[in-house]
Structure formats: C-alpha cells, structure tokens
C-alpha cells in the first residue's frame, strides 16, 4: 500500500437523469516522494481523480487514503496547486507563497528567507 492509495475508486455523476461513469475501478499506489504523471485524453477522468485524492470530491465507491487516513474532505496539511492559478487577490505574492509554508508549519522566522529564495528563483523579484 502506497503513501497515497486508491482502491477500486468509482465515480459517477448524473447527466440528464442518467448515471455517467467517470472513474471505474481505479487502483493506484504512490509512494512518498514519488513523482507521477497522469496522462489521458480530455474527459478521461484525470481531474476527477485528482480532485478525489485532494478531497474536493468523494468517490461514489472505493477508497482513497493518504498516509493511512481515508480522504473524506480537503486537509490543511496537504497543499494543492491548481491548473488555473488560484492566488488570493487580497494577499501579496509573498503572502500567497507563505500559505504553503504555514500549512507545513515552517517557523514564522524562517519563512522570509525561503520566500525570498523562491521569488528570486522564478524571477519575480524585479
């Protein structure tokens, strides 16, 4: 069993009063620190699976666990990076970056140096 484990995941939506199967018996194990890529055509269920793993949607049947805990809702200790940038417009760039550090419980006094490092790395310091 992986750090992230998907077992017999099934997801249906209702469309025009009929069930539409998006995920069918999906099984997947991802080890901690492992990098994977989900590939498939548009509409094949990639985003639905990721939303279920993140806890934004529940599977119709089957189970998803992270570090042995069943996923039933989004968890503050896990950070999701969205395809469409989801910056909080009332926060600065630095403050948006700090959200991830807060969720990982990085000490407040260490955050400015970390933020500065990555802002410079991606060229946002100009």
Map each language-model feature to its residues.
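Helix-to-loop junction immediately C-terminal to a conserved catalytic motif
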Residues: 54
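The feature captures the beta-strand-to-loop junction immediately N-terminal to the Walker
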Residues: 39-41
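Short helical segment in ABC ATPase nucleotide-binding domains corresponding to the A-loop/adjacent helical element
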Residues: 94-102, 112, 116
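Beta-to-alpha transition at the N-cap of a short helix in the ABC ATPase nucleotide-binding domain
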Residues: 77, 83, 92-94, 99
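Conserved ABC transporter NBD signature motif
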Residues: 62-73
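Short beta-strand immediately N-terminal to the Walker A/P-loop
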Residues: 36-37, 80
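Conserved ABC ATPase "signature" region
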Residues: 107-126
